[in-house]
Amino acid sequence: MKRFKDMKSKWALILAFVMIVSVVVPAVLFSATDNVNAATGKSYDKTSLSYTGTYTDISLKKDADFKNAKYVSSSDEIISALQSAKAGDVIIIKGGTYKFSTSVIVNNTINGQDGSYIIVKAEDNHDVKFDFSAQVFNSQNRGFILDGDYWYFGGINFYGAGDNGVLLAGNNNIFERCVFEANRDTGLQLSRYDTTAATKDLWPSNNLIINCTAFNNCDFPEQGGTGENADGFAAKLTCGEGNVFDGCISYCNSDDGWDLYAKTATGPIGVVTIRNCVAFANGTLTNGTHYANGDMNGFKLGGSGVGTPHNVLNCLSFDNGATGFTDNNNPSALTLTNLTAWGNGKNAKKGNFVCYRAGSGAEYSGLISVNAVDSDKFMGNVKNSIYYNSKKYYQLSGDSFTQILNTSAGYKSGTVVNNPSSASGTFKNINNTIKYTDNIDELLRNADGTINMNGLYETTGSYSSMGAKFNVANQIVYVTGKSSDNDKETESSSENTSETTTAQETTKSDEPVSSAAHVMNFTTDITEQNAYFTISGNYSESKGSVIYNGMTLTKCLKIETATSISFTCDTDSELTLVFNSNFAKKIKIDGVKTAATNG
């Protein structure tokens, strides 16, 4: 493909169009890459099913882009840099393993600002490990405690702590492409640090955990633990609103992949969103060790009869010892959308979905249960899903919800179907060759950090509207409003072994974009006018097609003499056009003929 980037004009947002043309007539289609100024999540679309991955602009930058960065290369230098950091600072940690025998604490007086994060990242192309394994097993021995606001951490392995690898207690923070390994409680936990913070508005809020991995976290019974406290990720007990996990993988932890537990003593926690995430083999460590006390769920979504209506979308859960997804006695209107649960429950003999204690207003759509070992259980409203009950699979088709009163009481609804795994042409790949000892990030992630399951357990054909999908289209989150000295144009491409995703291009102006991108997909929808653009012209489905970000686009707006697209906006932004190889490489903008070039 060829790309053309227009000079800056007075538009309020980034507009992205894909151009497909024959030799004679060009045509406009749709670009799938959303560009947002979302360091705080204000414009970040955390509920969209259009995007199966997210990454930040920082992940696209090189160390050299941060001209005034401070480089550190010892444990003492790291602590000193953290304690003296101020808004806009960039701390780059040289490759290596850094040992700490006590907790590293960033208190709530050390903060970045909206648009001016404090950035702490691993040196390019180097591994950085914070090794806390000298700590003894003790609930006070967290490895890293972040109580500050507006921090970004990238590419760091938090290893071996006596309790949590990271206790995240601040607000508006981002962890990207970090690893939480072999800690003796939860790898990363969102909860208060100040125990006098008694109300939800004082608890950690609006944090984004993106493309991180947690594994082998275990509270070993032989060290005084129980084996049932160490999750991969947790947002529990005392966490506030707006926290998001996006593109994370949690596997081989002694307890749960995700834990959103709440209790009556502290009351409901804030709504947590989990999207584009994968949980597998929780309840068994990578060396095969299994502790029966572990809860072993992929996604545990509550506890104690204390309700919060959490959101889980486009997630995959397989081979966990207990359930794939459970309400865990959360009596709220949970929203579970496009989830795949495959072969969970082999240790605890539980169903793939156990949500019979949720509120009657709970909504389940696009769920698919496969190779279940016990009945799925629901309370709420189900549509476009396949579930398992009493040794049979039932399909609820269509776009209308069916109220499921309580499948645990033997209630059944829908059409009896075969186990989805036995139906031909319904999954891209059902051959799971993952070994627990594999380098999972190398195996299951693209170069930009987003998840690529290589088609494993991804539905296709008549089941394609159900279940989780990865490696389709990505969002970019801008973090470096003022933090970087060099807001230059960056480019990212997804690399994978079995599927191809077109390279995505993102462009950053001197000031952050004020809202999410607005896009137009003529293949699925036609809007002649909205608040930002007006289109006049003819459409065609005979000009060929283009593959872009995993989508096949077939309907186009023909670029003819009478065709016009006008924009009505009032602040700086940029327009990106993407051409296929047959385009004549010429286009007229504001009456000026402009030539497209490669790149």
Could you describe each region identified by the protein language model?
Residues 583-593:
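Short, surface-exposed beta-strand/strand-loop-strand elements in extracellular ectodomains
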Residues 42-68, 227-228, 233, 358-488:
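Acidic, glycine- and Ser/Thr-rich low-complexity intrinsically disordered tracts
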Residues 117, 123-126, 149-160, 172-185, ...:
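Right-handed parallel beta-helix
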